[in-house]
A protein has these predicted regions:
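Canonical Radical SAM [4Fe-4S] cluster-binding loop centered on the CxxxCxxC motif
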Residues: 1-4
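Glycine-rich anion/phosphate-binding loops
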Residues: 6-9
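Conserved AdoMet/S-adenosylmethionine-binding subsite of the radical SAM
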Residues: 14-172
Length: 173
Protein backbone atom coordinates (compact mmCIF):
# COMPACT_ATOMS: atom_id res chain seq x y z
CA UNK A 1 0.00 0.00 0.00
CA UNK A 2 2.98 2.34 -0.31
CA UNK A 3 2.99 5.45 -2.41
CA UNK A 4 4.66 5.49 -5.82
CA UNK A 5 8.08 7.04 -5.50
CA UNK A 6 8.26 6.33 -1.78
CA UNK A 7 11.54 4.45 -2.16
CA UNK A 8 13.03 7.37 -4.06
CA UNK A 9 11.91 9.68 -1.24
CA UNK A 10 13.44 7.34 1.34
CA UNK A 11 16.77 7.60 -0.45
CA UNK A 12 16.45 11.39 -0.47
CA UNK A 13 15.85 11.30 3.29
CA UNK A 14 18.98 9.20 3.76
CA UNK A 15 20.96 11.70 1.67
CA UNK A 16 19.53 14.66 3.61
CA UNK A 17 20.46 13.04 6.93
CA UNK A 18 24.04 12.51 5.76
CA UNK A 19 24.24 16.12 4.51
CA UNK A 20 22.97 17.34 7.90
CA UNK A 21 25.77 15.50 9.67
CA UNK A 22 24.05 12.36 10.93
CA UNK A 23 26.50 9.92 12.52
CA UNK A 24 24.62 6.97 11.05
CA UNK A 25 21.47 5.89 9.26
CA UNK A 26 19.63 4.17 12.13
CA UNK A 27 16.83 2.01 10.74
CA UNK A 28 14.54 1.14 13.65
CA UNK A 29 12.40 -2.00 13.34
CA UNK A 30 12.95 -2.01 9.56
CA UNK A 31 12.42 -5.67 8.72
CA UNK A 32 8.98 -5.26 7.15
CA UNK A 33 10.48 -2.60 4.86
CA UNK A 34 13.54 -4.62 3.81
CA UNK A 35 12.85 -4.43 0.08
CA UNK A 36 12.32 -0.65 0.15
CA UNK A 37 15.37 -0.10 2.35
CA UNK A 38 17.60 -2.15 0.06
CA UNK A 39 16.34 -0.29 -2.99
CA UNK A 40 16.81 3.09 -1.30
CA UNK A 41 20.34 2.25 -0.14
CA UNK A 42 21.36 1.13 -3.61
CA UNK A 43 24.61 -0.73 -4.15
CA UNK A 44 27.12 1.87 -3.05
CA UNK A 45 28.67 2.29 0.38
CA UNK A 46 27.30 5.22 2.38
CA UNK A 47 29.67 7.66 4.12
CA UNK A 48 28.12 6.79 7.51
CA UNK A 49 27.27 3.37 8.94
CA UNK A 50 23.88 1.88 8.16
CA UNK A 51 22.41 0.51 11.41
CA UNK A 52 19.81 -2.30 11.53
CA UNK A 53 18.10 -1.74 14.90
CA UNK A 54 15.80 -4.72 15.50
CA UNK A 55 14.11 -7.00 18.00
CA UNK A 56 16.37 -9.95 17.22
CA UNK A 57 13.61 -12.19 15.85
CA UNK A 58 14.98 -12.03 12.31
CA UNK A 59 15.31 -14.66 9.63
CA UNK A 60 18.83 -15.48 8.51
CA UNK A 61 17.58 -15.32 4.91
CA UNK A 62 16.50 -11.70 5.31
CA UNK A 63 19.77 -10.81 7.01
CA UNK A 64 21.79 -12.39 4.20
CA UNK A 65 20.11 -9.97 1.80
CA UNK A 66 21.54 -7.11 3.86
CA UNK A 67 25.13 -8.28 3.62
CA UNK A 68 27.42 -5.46 2.54
CA UNK A 69 24.68 -2.86 3.00
CA UNK A 70 24.47 -2.83 6.82
CA UNK A 71 27.57 -2.13 8.89
CA UNK A 72 26.08 -2.20 12.39
CA UNK A 73 23.46 -4.51 13.85
CA UNK A 74 21.64 -3.62 17.10
CA UNK A 75 19.55 -6.69 17.92
CA UNK A 76 17.69 -7.33 21.13
CA UNK A 77 18.24 -10.70 22.73
CA UNK A 78 15.10 -10.77 24.84
CA UNK A 79 15.01 -14.42 25.81
CA UNK A 80 17.36 -17.35 26.20
CA UNK A 81 14.53 -19.52 27.54
CA UNK A 82 11.53 -20.68 25.53
CA UNK A 83 9.03 -20.47 28.39
CA UNK A 84 9.12 -16.69 28.90
CA UNK A 85 9.42 -16.19 25.13
CA UNK A 86 6.18 -18.13 24.65
CA UNK A 87 4.44 -16.49 27.61
CA UNK A 88 5.31 -12.87 26.97
CA UNK A 89 5.90 -12.77 23.20
CA UNK A 90 4.00 -15.80 21.85
CA UNK A 91 7.26 -16.96 20.25
CA UNK A 92 8.61 -20.09 21.92
CA UNK A 93 11.25 -20.32 19.19
CA UNK A 94 12.55 -16.80 19.87
CA UNK A 95 15.79 -18.02 21.54
CA UNK A 96 16.76 -20.22 18.59
CA UNK A 97 15.73 -17.70 15.92
CA UNK A 98 17.44 -14.76 17.63
CA UNK A 99 20.66 -16.68 18.27
CA UNK A 100 20.85 -17.77 14.63
CA UNK A 101 20.18 -14.18 13.55
CA UNK A 102 22.91 -12.79 15.81
CA UNK A 103 25.39 -15.34 14.51
CA UNK A 104 24.55 -14.29 10.94
CA UNK A 105 24.94 -10.62 11.87
CA UNK A 106 28.35 -11.33 13.33
CA UNK A 107 29.36 -13.38 10.29
CA UNK A 108 28.68 -10.32 8.16
CA UNK A 109 30.35 -7.67 10.30
CA UNK A 110 33.08 -9.44 12.22
CA UNK A 111 34.47 -7.90 15.42
CA UNK A 112 33.16 -4.47 16.34
CA UNK A 113 35.13 -1.40 15.31
CA UNK A 114 34.92 2.08 16.82
CA UNK A 115 36.13 5.29 15.23
CA UNK A 116 38.46 7.76 16.96
CA UNK A 117 35.46 9.33 18.71
CA UNK A 118 34.25 6.00 20.08
CA UNK A 119 31.35 5.72 17.64
CA UNK A 120 30.50 2.21 16.47
CA UNK A 121 31.37 1.90 12.77
CA UNK A 122 30.97 -1.82 12.30
CA UNK A 123 29.82 -4.80 14.34
CA UNK A 124 27.06 -6.14 16.54
CA UNK A 125 25.77 -4.56 19.74
CA UNK A 126 23.49 -7.05 21.52
CA UNK A 127 20.94 -5.52 23.89
CA UNK A 128 19.12 -7.31 26.69
CA UNK A 129 16.36 -5.77 28.77
CA UNK A 130 16.12 -7.24 32.27
CA UNK A 131 12.50 -8.22 32.88
CA UNK A 132 10.89 -8.49 36.33
CA UNK A 133 11.15 -11.96 37.84
CA UNK A 134 13.24 -13.18 34.90
CA UNK A 135 16.67 -13.38 36.50
CA UNK A 136 17.35 -16.88 35.18
CA UNK A 137 16.50 -15.77 31.64
CA UNK A 138 18.91 -12.83 31.98
CA UNK A 139 21.66 -15.11 33.34
CA UNK A 140 21.17 -17.46 30.39
CA UNK A 141 21.36 -14.58 27.90
CA UNK A 142 24.61 -13.36 29.46
CA UNK A 143 25.99 -16.90 29.52
CA UNK A 144 25.19 -17.46 25.84
CA UNK A 145 26.82 -14.21 24.76
CA UNK A 146 29.88 -14.89 26.92
CA UNK A 147 30.26 -18.46 25.70
CA UNK A 148 29.62 -17.65 22.05
CA UNK A 149 31.77 -14.56 21.58
CA UNK A 150 35.27 -13.76 22.77
CA UNK A 151 36.03 -10.36 24.32
CA UNK A 152 36.31 -7.77 21.58
CA UNK A 153 33.99 -9.53 19.16
CA UNK A 154 30.61 -7.99 20.07
CA UNK A 155 29.34 -5.30 22.38
CA UNK A 156 26.69 -6.08 25.01
CA UNK A 157 24.23 -3.68 26.64
CA UNK A 158 22.36 -4.81 29.73
CA UNK A 159 19.33 -2.55 30.19
CA UNK A 160 17.21 -2.20 33.32
CA UNK A 161 14.71 0.49 32.37
CA UNK A 162 11.65 -1.78 31.99
CA UNK A 163 8.47 -0.11 33.26
CA UNK A 164 5.35 -2.29 33.36
CA UNK A 165 2.18 -0.65 32.06
CA UNK A 166 -1.25 -1.88 31.02
CA UNK A 167 -3.32 -4.68 32.54
CA UNK A 168 -0.85 -6.12 35.02
CA UNK A 169 -3.41 -8.43 36.65
CA UNK A 170 -2.85 -10.98 33.89
CA UNK A 171 0.85 -11.14 34.86
CA UNK A 172 0.84 -11.71 38.64
CA UNK A 173 4.55 -12.45 38.75
Amino acid sequence: YGKPGATRRLREIFEELVEQGAACLDLVTPTHFTDAVLEALGGERWPVPVVWNCGGYESAETLKRLEGRVQVYLPDLKYALSEPAARYSAAADYPQVARAAILEMYRQTGPFRLDEDGMLQRGVLIRHLILPQQGENTRRVIDWVGQTFAPGQVLFSLMSQYTPVGDLAQWPE
